[in-house]
Amino acid sequence: MGSAQEEISVDVLVIGAGPTGLGAAKRLHQINGPSWLIVDSNETPGGLASTDVTPEGFLYDVGGHVIFSHYKYFDDCIDEALPNEDDWYTHQRISYVRYKGLWVPYPYQNNISMLPKEDQAAAVDGMIDAALAARVANTKPADFDEHIMRTMGEGIANQFMRPYNFKVWAVPPKKMQCAWLGERVATPDVKKVVNNIIHNKTAGGWGPNATFRFPAKDGTGGIWIAVAKTLPDSKKRFGEHGTVTKVDANAKRVTFKDGTVVNYNKLVNTMAVDALVEHMGDKELIDLSKDLYYSSTHVIGVGIRGERPERIGDKCWLYFPEDNCPFYRATIFSNYSPYNQPQKGVKLATQQLGDGSKPSSSELKDGPYWSIMLEVSESSMKPVDQKNLLKDSIQGLINTEMIKPGDEIVSTYHRRFDHGYPTPSLEREGVLTKLLPALQDRDIWSRGRFGSWRYEVGNQDHSFMLGVEAVDSIVNGAVELTLNYPDFVNGRRNTERRLQDGAQLFANKKAGMQVDTEL
């Protein structure tokens, strides 16, 4: 839309075309009331839910994304974008923790029965101590580490929870708060755990993503490209001419890299809020945002020639708390869709063997192929040797028996994402309870995984609905449940909003619909 150096005016400007920005735009398009525009510095929509393709044809998401949903409106929107049965694969989550050479079913704390006897004893000891202490505790845990100790005890804390969470967050659990936990961490039932140990049984199926969907083609990014296509081209500015250089909150003007200026009445911002306040040049808010912490994410992909090994089987994602590999999670990405890697007839050269040695031949050969996607966190408290990370990760795959030294690696991928995880730090709420209202007082709704910085509502469905609900707040003053009451939305099926019913409702009521008079 539009050429350089122009001036545009809209009622609502949406910055960012990841899930949150697209949620806002989708709702604005559905309401068909206020004028609006969505902008993004990337040519391709999707944000942190995008997908890259290697030169050899292997797909890798920006980390481990799967579709499970708490909202019918979200389901409606992605089903509209990808409406056919063959657009999707549905999977049972098959997930394990690697511990002392064993594959322990996830969640670890519910499957102590799989551990060596001495670890079982330490885990049960700790759980009993924790259960007894919890009975007399009259204060809430001060931090995530204290929560772990109170709910699981020292055995599980030392075996899994402390080392694993440090690998994920790149911050010790002592420095994290625990209000974010909700459905994110399974609390063990001591009686059930002991019962499973005696009967040598495992427990599984816990959590919101015990089953999930994955797109057949184009990875997770394909979902958001398809959602963006349901929006009119005239209201999208993606790429260089969608790159924000300045936000003047007082004048309600946003300047873009090509010189274009957009005047707005209300702004839905989904870029990282620390970047937003820098673009605003507001020293007070910049200083406030400095107490928001985040970790960076390295995504590493390894494409391998050969049939998927039996030891890998139909595993989905795997957790690695130990220090024999740099990654905290591995996803068998080729299990999600047969189109996440080149087809069998595609001829590729072997780039290296698993042990790093050169192949005996550079001849192009057929598949089949399978792939692994790895995630490594980085922060000032957990630095990463970036130069050797790919090599160290492949060695980690050998150390954990995921691949063999002689396996033929035909493709590798490594990309660093500066803003990977918004850390639920001890300081977080103190910042957000001042920063987000201060922005809203200036008619800026900052929302999204990093726009509002709340990890507990940072999945794709949550992120999308943060945008939808921001628009409803702007247009009719509706309460934003996802932002303000995460436990409430996570504990129910949210069916109040629907795409089709809503569209008819808006069409019927449009003549009499009241839109915020400032719009």
What are these regions (language model features)?
Residues T20, T44, D274:
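Conserved Rossmann-like nucleotide-cofactor binding loop
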Residues H29-P55:
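Glycine-rich FAD pyrophosphate-binding loop
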Residues Y264-K266, T270-W445, S452-E456, D461-L466, ...:
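C-terminal segments that line or cap access tunnels to active or ligand-binding sites in enzymes
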Residues E7-I38:
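N-terminal Rossmann-like FAD-binding beta1-loop-alpha1 element of flavoenzymes
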Residues I8-V10, K257-K266:
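Core beta-strand elements of the Rossmann-like FAD/NAD(P) dinucleotide-binding domain
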Residues E56-V136:
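Dinucleotide-binding Rossmann-like beta1-alpha1 core, especially the glycine-rich loop
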Residues R416, I474-L519:
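Active-site-proximal substrate-binding core of FAD-dependent oxidoreductases
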Residues I112-S113, Q120-K252, T270:
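Active-site/ligand-binding neighborhood in enzyme catalytic cores
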